[in-house]
Structures are given as C-alpha cells and as structure tokens.
C-alpha cells in the first residue's frame, strides 16, 4: 500500500512541480550542469578541459542531467525536469524518513506532516531556489536516503561501510555535505561513545557501531579529497577557489543574521515580509491579491514553527540509542547555519541555497518529533481540533501550490534569438556568462556561444563553467557577438 501510494503521489507531484518550475525561467547556472551532463553522456566522464565552480555537483545533479538527456537530448526544458524530479523525490524521502518505523495512522501522520511542510514552495524566489538549477538541494536527496538506511537497517558491519560510500560519493560533488551529514554524524556518534564510557563505563569494543560511523564520516572526507585529486591528475575538471570559505567583516554580521532568517522563511514559504514590501527579490504574487498572498505566507509559518519545535526536541535524543537520525539532523542544521552566517555569501536571502538542507531536515524533524508530543495531550477534543486545523492548513498549502502551477510558463530571454541566429547561419559566436551556455542548451547545441570577459582592447576566455577546447582556434571559430541590456536579463541581440 505504501509503495503504490508513494508512486501515485510521486507522479502527481512531479507534473505539478514541473509546471511550477516552468514559471521561473532557466538561467545559465542550470545550463552549465546541463552541458556538463551532455559532455559526460558523450564519453567525457572526467569532464576533461572543464573549469567548474567551487561546487561541482559532479556526482549528484550532473549525472542526473546526463540521464535526462539520454532520453530527451539537450533541450531547454532539461533544467525544469531535473528540478521537478529532484524535489519530488526529496519530498517523498523526507516523508519516509519522518515516518520512521511507525505504521498505520501514526506513520501516515508523520509522513504527511513532513511532506506537507515541503509540498508547496512559495511562488517566486523559493520556486527558483527549490525547483530550478542545482543549488545544494539535490545533495540532500542521497543524504536523506542514507539516513533512512541508518534509521531502518540493523546494526551490521556493512551499514557504516555503505554510509561511508554514500558520504564519499556526495562530498565529491558538494562539500556542503561535510557540514550537513559527515560532520554531524561524527559529532553525535563520538559524543555518544564518550558519554557511554564516562557515564555507563562501557568499553570501546561494545560501541563498535558508533565508532565505525565516526570512522566512515572522517574517512569519507579523505576519500573524497583523494578522488578529486585523482581526477585532476587524470586531467579531469578543474575547480575554482571556494568563495564561501572567506569570512565577512564583524560589523556585517547583524545583516547576515537577518538575511539568514529571511532566507529560511523564504524556503519554508513563510516570507510574507518581502510580499508586503513588494520587493522584487522576494516572493511574487502572480496576480494574487496582496492580502491573500500575505495570509498564505503567514500560514506557512505553521510549518516553520513545527520544524523549529522538532529541531529543539531532537536534542532530547542526543544520547538516546533508540534514535540516531534525529540528533544528527538537528546537529547538521546547527553546523550548516553556524558556518553560513559569518561567511561572505550570506548577505542576501537568495544566498540561502547554501543552507537549503534546513528545509528537508527541519521537515523530517517535525514529522519525527511533533506527533508524539501531540499524542500525549490529555484532552481528546484538543487533539481533534488540532487535526482539523492541520488538515485546513494543508489544504491552503495545496491551494497555493495549485495557484502557482497554474501560472503561465516563462521562457528564458535567450530562446527568442535562436531562430534568428540559425536563419542567418550564425552558429558560433561569443557572449557573456548570462547568455552563453543558456543559448547552447536552448538550441540543443546547434548554436555555440562561448563565454568571454571583455577587456578594453580584447576579449579573453572566461575560465568559469567553460571547457578549454571552446577557445582553441583549431576547433572553434567565432564571427559574431551576442549582447543584451547590460547583460542583466534583457532580450539578446547579435552583432556580427
């Protein structure tokens, strides 16, 4: 029953999320991974010649794009399909992890609570964050599946080994997993070992499972680092420096804290402040009356409040051997946010992509922690009233999701120029980052625009999300330039 129901829900959610994703135009950030997946699909498994951003997604979303392109080819819609598929699976994985070992009605409530919190991304910036190009969200999917294994599987020797393999695989593509999974797992397990030794006089041998998980977490970083260096030694992709590793000035921390809180509200759909201020950087109304949009965002505060409640309750189980996953998730939120706030990338709400794991982790904690606490309420009528309120809130979430999915799809600004370029036999040119890779993806590779940086006297190759052979005059030739309105999102035009 659970399998059939999950498959049905997954199919419905995928098409709804696909519609919602299409309401936010694709950008070059997503096109980068689409082109890398296309290159990988055509045999360049190590992405030789590529210079990639500080987060490569080499083992997460890039293979996902390759699989999609295997069946569909290189198309403009690949970004939306990948985003919808990832988020659909993430919602279901969060629900299953929140369910734990519960069955029947209790299991359904836990599943619905976690999935319900995530089910309706806020129309606008949150849609872009959760349903568009890779932004660390896809990293959370294999991590949730690993936590599901730790939650359900017996304590056998091969479980830490499997966890180490998953962590290594994910860290290769996204080092944020060190903050959200590997580090927290090592901290919680090490603390439990130390507590058991000091409090209960337990030997290290009797705690082999926890020690094995600590070792798996630590070794996953070493194995991932070794793998990345091996790829480099084999002339695979190169990585640009990590911008987020730099710290912000101390006087900017209050603004960073404010932006972090705003980003978390936004990813939970509870960003009514930017709606009420009519900010272009926050949620969009899409024709919805302002009062309704603010009220709907305020309702999402219910989900955020439940996640916060579950987050704090999870620390009660920090040393409880019956529940390993909950304190690890809560610790992951703490470490991720603590590393994010003082960094240079936390100045604006849309930078919350660096802490996007807070959404699925918080939703899971709400599902695992809150129903048990509510079940202990003494009065039956109070429980019934809360159940009706919960159903009503979920209905409002679904109504908001349906409204967002019903909006008109938005084509990116570069699609309109492609037919004109092809009609004039202009198929190899130069452009800046916002349009270059996006045009290549939109055209299915028929039009090649190569990213450059314009200096006062010439153009130079831009070694960022680009491939070295594009700039080899023996293989490439450019006879026109694509520009747009200050390269800030206007419609593109070509200059031969």
Task: Indicate where each model-derived feature is located.
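Membrane-interface micro-motifs in multi-pass membrane enzymes
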Residues: 54, 58, 104-151, 350-362, ...
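Transmembrane-helix motifs of polytopic, lipid-linked glycan transferases
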Residues: 7-10, 81-107, 145, 305-308
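Signature aromatic-anchored transmembrane alpha helix within multi-pass, membrane-resident enzymes
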Residues: 2-8, 215, 219, 329, ...
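Short periplasmic/luminal acceptor-recognition loop of GT-C membrane glycosyltransferases, typified by
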Residues: 55, 423-460
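Short hydrophobic/aromatic helix or loop-helix immediately within or flanking a transmembrane segment
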Residues: 32-38, 51-74, 263-283
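Membrane-interface alpha helices of multi-pass inner-membrane proteins
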Residues: 158-184
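Hydrophobic/aromatic-rich transmembrane helices and adjacent perimembrane loops
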Residues: 134-142, 179-180, 288-305, 322-378
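Membrane-interface helix-loop-helix junctions at transmembrane boundaries of multi-pass membrane enzymes
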Residues: 105-108, 193-212, 282-333
